[in-house]
């Protein structure tokens, strides 16, 4: 579903990321690993050794592709954290390959195409069974 959405929009002057000290990151939070916005699924810290700072080992899953990334950084260094926006919509219909989604504001959004493949079939099946909530994660994020 992420392939069909526009994640390049945001408020004027909004930054794609903000810095956070590595030691302040937490599991289930977000971080940029290898240039990709990831959700942190594993995190461990090594003790300070005689040759430097404590190190933090991070394992994250790309929020758009599901690919796994890892990185190790000193606990005192800053890492980029992506600005993530989470939106819940009520799925009120599927017509001609597009989703009809009710926003919190009461407006209906009908510009999102039903994803192809397994994800699209799963959404249709859940809708047919009465599930109506769709969560969309968006990030104002660009790769260079």
Swiss-Prot record:
**UniProt cross-references to InterPro entries, sorted A to Z:** IF5A-like (IPR001884), IF5A-like_N (IPR048670), NA-bd_OB-fold (IPR012340), Rib_uL2_dom2 (IPR014722), Trans_elong_IF5A_hypusine_site (IPR019769), Transl_elong_IF5A_C (IPR020189), Translation_prot_SH3-like_sf (IPR008991)
What is the membrane topology listed in the Swiss-Prot or TrEMBL record? Peripheral membrane protein
| Stored PROSITE patterns | IF5A_HYPUSINE (PS00302)
Keywords, A to Z?
Acetylation, Cytoplasm, Elongation factor, Endoplasmic reticulum, Hypusine, Membrane, Nucleus, Protein biosynthesis, RNA-binding
Q: Which GO terms describe its biological process?
A: positive regulation of translational elongation; positive regulation of translational termination; translational elongation
Hypusine carried by residues: 50
Cite the GO molecular-function annotations of the record: ribosome binding; RNA binding; translation elongation factor activity
Q: Where in the cell is it found?
A: Cytoplasm; Nucleus; Endoplasmic reticulum membrane
Where would you find the membrane-spanning parts of this chain?
none
For this record, an example GO cellular component is: endoplasmic reticulum membrane
Residues annotated with N-acetylalanine modification:
2
Q: Where does the source fall among the domains of life?
A: Eukaryota
PTM: Lys-50 undergoes hypusination, a unique post-translational modification that consists in the addition of a butylamino group from spermidine to lysine side chain, leading to the formation of the unusual amino acid hypusine. eIF-5As are the only known proteins to undergo this modification, which is essential for their function.
| Known role | Translation factor that promotes translation elongation and termination, particularly upon ribosome stalling at specific amino acid sequence contexts. Binds between the exit (E) and peptidyl (P) site of the ribosome and promotes rescue of stalled ribosome: specifically required for efficient translation of polyproline-containing peptides as well as other motifs that stall the ribosome. Acts as a ribosome quality control (RQC) cofactor by joining the RQC complex to facilitate peptidyl transfer during CAT tailing step.
Recorded hits in NCBIfam families, A to Z, give:
eIF_5A
Listed PANTHER family: TRANSLATION INITIATION FACTOR 5A FAMILY MEMBER
Relate the assembly described in the record: Binds to 80S ribosomes. Actively translating ribosomes show mutually exclusive binding of eIF5a (EIF5A or EIF5A2) and EEF2/eEF2. Interacts with DAPL1; interaction takes place at the polypeptide exit tunnel of hibernating ribosomes and prevents translation.
What family is reported?
Belongs to the eIF-5A family.
Q: What is this protein called?
A: Eukaryotic translation initiation factor 5A-1
């Amino acid at each position: 579903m992420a392939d069909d959405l526009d994640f390049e929009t945001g408020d004027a002057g909004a930054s794609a990321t903000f810095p956070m000290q590595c030691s302040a990151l937490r599991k289930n939070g977000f971080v940029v690993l290898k240039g990709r916005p990831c959700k942190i699924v594993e995190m461990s810290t090594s003790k300070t050794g005689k040759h430097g700072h404590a190190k933090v080992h991070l394992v994250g899953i790309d929020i758009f592709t599901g690919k796994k990334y890892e990185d190790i950084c000193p606990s005192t260094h800053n890492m980029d954290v992506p600005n993530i926006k989470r939106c819940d919509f009520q799925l009120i219909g599927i017509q001609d390959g597009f989703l009809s989604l009710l926003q919190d504001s009461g407006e209906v959004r009908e510009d999102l195409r039903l994803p192809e493949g397994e994800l699209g079939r799963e959404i249709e099946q859940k809708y047919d069974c009465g599930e109506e909530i769709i969560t969309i994660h968006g990030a104002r994020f660009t790769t260079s």
